[in-house]
Swiss-Prot record:
Protein name in the entry: SsrA-binding protein
Keyword Cytoplasm: yes
Compartment(s) of residence: Cytoplasm
UniProt gene name: smpB
Predominant cellular place of this UniProt entry's protein: cytoplasm
GO CC list: cytosol
């Protein structure tokens, strides 16, 4: 007998880091679990997360997420002292951890958080190995995106 999928109201995406895709070229993506406290889970369910300026560092053979803000709910966090920008441990396989650490130890590479989402009942973070873009690369991306929009507009008007 197959297992029923849990009903998820709305989107499974909690937060996205759109700036990371603009400022970095993403080479490879990984999915990581998060070690959270109870009030953080309730805040994530309410969509109170922000991933801008968040990145991953490695200490003592473990990965930690820095700079991610989870705003506490007044109802859920009245009896605990909440730190919205605390460092959160990431759950990765040993092979993934070694791969990420090897890439980051090279020059110019960093690991940034791209998005946070629900996978069944678990909150996950999509992290990416990234290399910083130069200004001219950013301008080229903007030109390419605008040309795609113009091309779609021209094709739409040509079909009429």
């Amino acid at each position: 007998m197959t297992k029923k999928k849990a009903y998820k109201p709305g989107s499974a995406t909690i937060a996205q880091n759109k700036r990371a895709r603009h400022e970095y070229s993403i080479e490879e993506e990984f999915e990581a679990g998060l070690v959270l406290q109870g009030w953080e889970v309730k805040s994530l369910r309410a969509g109170k997360a922000n991933l801008s300026d968040s990145y991953v560092t490695f200490m003592n053979g473990e990965a930690y997420l820095f700079g991610a803000t989870i705003t506490p709910l007044n109802v859920a966090s009245s009896h605990v002292v909440c730190d919205p920008i605390r460092t959160r441990k990431l759950l990765l396989n040993k092979r993934e951890m070694d791969s990420l650490f090897g890439r980051v130890s090279r020059d110019g590479y960093t690991v940034v958080a791209l998005s946070m989402y629900w996978k069944n009942a678990w909150s996950k973070v999509k992290i990416g190995v990234a290399k910083g873009k130069k200004d001219h690369d950013k301008r080229d991306d903007i030109k390419e995106r605008e040309w795609k929009l113009d091309k779609a507009r021209i094709m739409k008007n040509a079909n009429r």
